[in-house]
From Swiss-Prot:
Residues 4-245 form the ABC transporter domain. It comes from Syntrophobacter fumaroxidans (strain DSM 10017 / MPOB). The keyword ATP-binding applies. GO terms for cellular component: plasma membrane. Its EC number is 7.6.2.-. ATP binds at G40, T41, S42, G43, S44, G45, K46, T47. Gene3D superfamilies: P-loop containing nucleotide triphosphate hydrolases. This is Macrolide export ATP-binding/permease protein MacB. Its main location: membrane.
Length: 715
């Protein structure tokens, strides 16, 4: 059976509206083991015929059978597979890839073999072929380190790596001197005579054609009658014709080998223009760095806001007294004193959603120690529960107790700002401060909290038992229950303060005793007995905020004897709403910054697309060579897409490092809170890959659509 059989092959190119015939009814047969010289002048059609014979092109009409298979109607991928398994090419210009060693150039067709071989087996086969070509000492040399003859022998070894049935040599001596040309021709003769390789040598030089056993002349697209075999050629040996050997399953390479080769090819491409690659990835680096830095700064800020809110009491509600009005004029919140310590106890006992509650009495006056004085932002009379609700630990010392509250003990706990202003480095524990000339012993110092969301210094305060502040500092007393009671009372304020122990008997502690209906009726609301300025409520969870507000409202309305339809004589401030608002604002700002960063990533992606388009143009000949040795369109697409993704990954990796560095510098230099964001890093990696795929696809697709013939001729 003939290896090649052509019947009436015609090829016509259309230039505008004109049809230009190049091949005019070519019929030809080539037997296995034959050595044919296809000779003709420039423009005779010999190169077009070789391209059709080598499955690089398709005829306009006619029939072509290769090794018994009709190849005219094969798809491009099927023709590529046929070229890879059964056809080898040797070109006039060698077409070796400059950044690859001799062994790597020879191994290139193995990358596209259907079965594939491992890197180790492929290297051994390539090394053996190069040794047969007399290049055993130049395996790792790049083409620039080899002579012209040596480069052509590397090209021959590459053509033989997959044991092809047919070897095409297109003007193989065109760029060589006479001595080297004879050396290369002897290699072809030896391959044909000793190994039975079928060779078609394309040339215009009669002296080169003489090395073949058969000369086929072509003129103006028509084959001239053959003159017979070359008479002075030695007899062909009895070696069996070369057969395309299938690759055994034991030699199959895995995905890891494919990945390694693709990675090596991509890195070799990037090494050609390191500076250009670095500048190309600059947009990706800036975008990823911005994403990382903004996410970490945003997350740190969000955490800081949450901590600030927590320090103010994220799980807290503030209950304020009602509003008095006269003549249509409102006197503002707290103008009617409707809250009592008893309300605080009732809320804790009767509201399941409430964890704790603390009454608060406020005072505004100066605090004196020695010759120094300071007016703190807040002087709060409360209970020890206040610090539990606020989750506020002590830096040193102790907090006052419920016994201190019962006894109106003159003890206090200071905030850090007040300590700094009054004691200036001196340890305040055990010392005294005076509030309205009442001496209070300092028993504890609060840990610093800093400013709250409104910018107020939370450390500028003094805490003491509410009974001490109310009865010893602000001047409220039992005598002031009402004016008439005061006029008939003979006890002084001091005596009544000292009689507080009678209100809190040690046998059975009733911190806030009930008052009778008569007392409640006779006592004007603005000065109701044991009224407080505020009640701080700690709820069990933010999800139970609405339930807590509803329960508190029901309890207080019942206690204050409010009829249905009457307005509340109290108000509730919900910190969770402020928390949600601030969190929403922080999230919005983070998204805005991320949008800016994503724009930078898009700009970087456009840069990737641009550089990949340039790379496709620069490597057009390489693409044609890879297609000639068996690369399918999807192989070219995958390779260039891999390079684009690798470029983005490298830019992303550098961007992650830069972003982390920026985040660290912001923390060190500006003292802004930042927090490591693994989500941002993973997102940056994902975005980098996505940018590489999206913006690298078109250049890769364009590369895969190149015509191998046009690509090989590209200058």
């Amino acid at each position: 059976m003939d290896l090649i059989e052509l019947q009436d092959i015609r090829k016509t190119y259309r230039l505008g509206e004109i049809d230009v015939p190049v091949l005019r009814g070519i019929s030809l047969k080539v037997s296995p083991g034959d050595f044919v010289a296809l000779m003709g002048t420039s423009g005779s059609g010999k190169t077009t015929l070789m391209n059709i014979l080598g499955c690089l092109d398709r005829p306009t009409s006619g029939h072509y059978r290769f090794d018994g298979q009709d190849v005219v109607d094969l798809t491009p991928d099927q023709r590529a597979a046929l070229r890879n398994r059964k056809i080898g090419f040797v070109f006039q210009n060698f077409n070796l890839l400059p950044r690859m060693s001799a062994v790597e150039n020879v191994m290139m067709p193995l990358s596209y073999a259907g079965g594939g071989v491992s890197d180790q087996n492929g290297r051994e086969r390539a090394g053996a072929l190069l040794t047969r070509m007399g290049l055993g000492e130049h395996l790792d040399n790049e083409p620039s380190q080899l002579s012209g003859g040596q480069q052509q022998r590397v090209a021959i070894a590459r053509a033989l790596i997959n044991n092809p049935s047919l070897l095409f040599a297109d003007e193989p001596t065109g760029n060589l001197d006479s001595a080297t040309s004879e050396e290369v021709l002897r290699v072809f003769q030896r391959l044909n005579e000793e190994e039975g390789v079928t060779i078609i040598l394309v040339t215009h030089d009669p002296s080169v054609a003489q090395c073949a056993r058969r000369i086929v002349r072509i003129r103006d697209g028509v084959i001239e009658p053959e003159s017979g075999a070359v008479g002075d050629m030695p007899q062909v040996s009895k070696a069996a014709p070369a057969q395309s050997k299938p690759v055994h399953s034991a030699m199959r390479r895995g995905d890891l080998d494919k990945f390694r080769r693709s990675l090596h090819t991509a890195l070799s491409s990037l090494r050609r223009n390191v500076l250009r690659a670095a500048l190309t990835t600059l947009g990706i680096i800036i975008g990823v760095a911005a994403v990382i830095a903004m996410m970490e700064i945003g997350r740190g800020s969000s955490t800081a806001i949450q901590r600030t809110i927590a320090s103010m009491g994220a799980h807290t509600l503030a209950l304020l007294p009602g509003t008095a009005a006269s003549g249509g004029v409102s006197f503002g919140g707290g103008s009617v004193m409707t809250m009592t310590p008893q309300d605080s106890e009732a809320i804790v006992n009767e509201c399941p959603a409430v964890l704790a509650a603390a009454p608060i009495v406020r005072a505004r006056t100066q605090v004196v120690h020695g010759s120094r004085n300071w007016v703190p932002a807040g002087i709060y009379g409360t209970t020890p529960t206040f610090l539990e609700i606020r989750e506020w630990p002590l830096a040193e010392g102790d907090v006052f107790t419920e016994r201190d509250v019962r006894n109106a003990s003159k003890v206090c706990v200071l905030g850090q700002r007040l300590v700094d202003e009054l004691f200036q480095g001196e340890n305040p524990i055990g010392l005294e401060v005076r509030i309205k000339n009442v001496a209070f012993k300092v028993i504890g110092v609060l840990s610093p909290k800093g400013a709250n969301m409104m910018g107020m210094d939370q450390d500028d305060l003094l805490l003491a038992p509410w009974t001490a502040i109310k009865y010893r500092v602000t001047g409220s007393s039992l005598a002031n229950v009402n004016q008439s009671a005061a006029s008939t009372s003979s006890a002084s304020i001091t005596d009544q303060v000292n009689s507080l122990s009678n209100l809190y008997p040690t046998e059975k502690v009733v911190l806030y005793p009930e008052i009778s209906t008569t007392q409640a009726f006779d006592t004007p609301l603005p000065v109701r007995f044991t009224n407080v300025d505020q009640i701080l409520v700690g709820i069990r969870s933010t999800s139970g905020t609405r339930a807590a507000i509803r329960q508190i409202g029901e309890v207080l309305r019942e206690r204050h004897r409010l009829r249905p339809g009457e307005p509340d004589d109290f108000s509730v401030r919900d910190m969770t709403e402020m928390t949600k608002t601030l969190a929403s604002t922080a999230t919005m700002m983070t998204k805005l910054l991320l949008a800016v960063a994503l724009i930078s990533l898009i700009v970087g992606g456009v840069g990737i697309m641009n550089i990949m388009m340039v790379s496709v143009t620069e490597r057009t000949r390489e693409i044609g060579l890879r297609m000639a040795v068996g690369a399918r369109a999807k192989n070219i697409l995958q390779q260039f897409l891999f390079e684009a993704v690798l470029l983005c990954f490298l830019g992303g990796a550098v961007g992650i490092l830069v972003g982390r560095g920026i985040s660290h510098l912001v923390t060190v230099l500006l003292n802004w809170p930042t927090e490591l964001s693994l989500d941002a890093i993973l997102a940056a990696v994902g975005v980098s890959a996505t940018v590489g795929i999206v913006f690298g696809y078109y250049p890769a697709w364009k590369a895969s659509r190149l015509d191998p013939i046009v690509a090989l001729r590209y200058e």
